[in-house]
């Protein structure tokens, strides 16, 4: 526990110290910044804000985790677990980096196409499964305390879980500070679970990423001086999925990650309802003012028809939802 605290402090300090230099370099080189959605007019002023800040906190968290674990952890099984989780973080970070690179440096607005991104994510998920999950012999998922054996279909579950949550966190990263603190809340919850399970290797990884993310948040809160980009959001989502698998508490991510589930569900429901009503009535109709859900809140509060919410209000609401959901999971696991 003490080692994790030290690693978290080091990660925070290095991340917070390094980020201003990254931002300054970005600005000096006049690199194109984040593009904003025209439908949310209050965001247009952010156009050109440096992005890809996830590169910094991912490098910091990975480096600190590796250095501390190599010098302090002698158990080969623990080192294998750490390397497994870090591998999926790095792989998805590279996918996100490539997507950001194409958008910003090559001026390709969509970056990777949806098919290209999905293919790379599936390839990364397969590598994670065959190199780190399959050798462990795990083929069942924990469903509210009951082990559901999936056999060979566990492979498809892992792919769905990792790809799904990486994209879900990516959708959540739409306003200042929302994704970074939402992930911190999720990681703190998994840190408690890892501590109770005596999984101090996983706890070390969690601590270093929390520290690095908080260092990043110093420059990502409103008004944001930097965004994490796909390099950060895709990697963080994959990390949460991998941690839930490593701790054998897969089901908990549906509740701990309720914000990501809500954001993704809003997009899926909007698309389905729009297509359905267009086919039935000849015109597409919407459930939400705009998706993902955080934009709906910005444009008209919970009802979508009320007063506009500020980014801080949206952040506070969704952080609160995430915190309550996380407390519910801990209560289910250790109280009830």
From Swiss-Prot:
Subcellular location: Cell membrane
Pfam families listed in its UniProt record: Glycos_transf_4, MraY_sig1
EC numbers on record: 2.7.8.13
Record-level GO BP terms: cell division; cell wall organization; peptidoglycan biosynthetic process; regulation of cell shape
Cellular component per GO, a single term: plasma membrane
Cofactors: Mg(2+)
Coiled coil: none
UniProt membrane topology term: Multi-pass membrane protein
TM region positions: 3-23, 53-73, 78-98, 118-138, 143-163, 174-194, 200-220, 226-246, 254-274, 316-336
Primary localization: membrane
GO terms, molecular function: metal ion binding; phospho-N-acetylmuramoyl-pentapeptide-transferase activity
Family, as annotated: Belongs to the glycosyltransferase 4 family. MraY subfamily.
Name used for this protein in its record: Phospho-N-acetylmuramoyl-pentapeptide-transferase
Gene name, Swiss-Prot/TrEMBL: mraY
């Amino acid at each position: 526990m003490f080692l994790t605290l030290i690693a978290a402090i080091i990660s925070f300090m290095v991340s917070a110290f390094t980020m201003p230099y990254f931002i300054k370099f970005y600005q000096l080189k006049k690199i194109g910044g984040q593009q904003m959605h025209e439908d949310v007019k209050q965001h247009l002023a952010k156009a050109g804000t440096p992005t890809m800040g996830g590169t910094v906190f991912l490098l910091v968290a990975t480096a600190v985790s590796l250095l501390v674990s190599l010098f302090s952890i002698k158990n080969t099984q623990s080192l294998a677990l750490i390397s497994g989780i870090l591998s999926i973080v790095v792989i998805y970070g590279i996918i996100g980096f490539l997507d950001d690179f194409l958008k910003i440096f090559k001026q390709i607005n969509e970056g990777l196409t949806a098919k290209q991104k999905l293919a790379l994510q599936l390839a990364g998920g397969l590598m994670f499964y065959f190199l780190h999950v399959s050798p462990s012999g795990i083929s069942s998922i924990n469903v509210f305390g009951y082990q559901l054996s999936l056999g060979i279909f566990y492979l498809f579950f892992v792919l769905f879980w990792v790809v799904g949550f990486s994209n879900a966190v990516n959708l959540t990263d739409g306003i200042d500070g929302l994704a970074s603190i939402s992930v911190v809340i999720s990681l703190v919850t998994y840190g408690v679970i890892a501590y109770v399970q005596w999984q101090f290797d996983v706890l070390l990884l969690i601590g270093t990423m929390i520290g690095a993310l908080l260092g990043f948040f110093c420059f990502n809160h409103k008004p944001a001086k930097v965004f994490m980009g796909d390099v950060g959001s895709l990697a963080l989502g994959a990390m949460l999925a991998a941690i839930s698998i490593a701790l054998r508490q897969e089901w908990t991510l549906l509740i701990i990650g309720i914000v990501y589930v809500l954001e993704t569900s809003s997009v899926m429901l909007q698309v389905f309802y729009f297509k359905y009503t267009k086919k039935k009535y000849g015109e597409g109709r919407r459930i939400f003012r705009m998706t993902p859900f955080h934009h709906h809140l910005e444009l008209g509060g919970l009802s979508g028809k009320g007063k506009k919410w500020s980014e801080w209000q949206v952040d506070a609401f969704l952080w609160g939802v995430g915190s309550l959901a996380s407390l519910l999971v801990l209560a289910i696991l250790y109280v009830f």
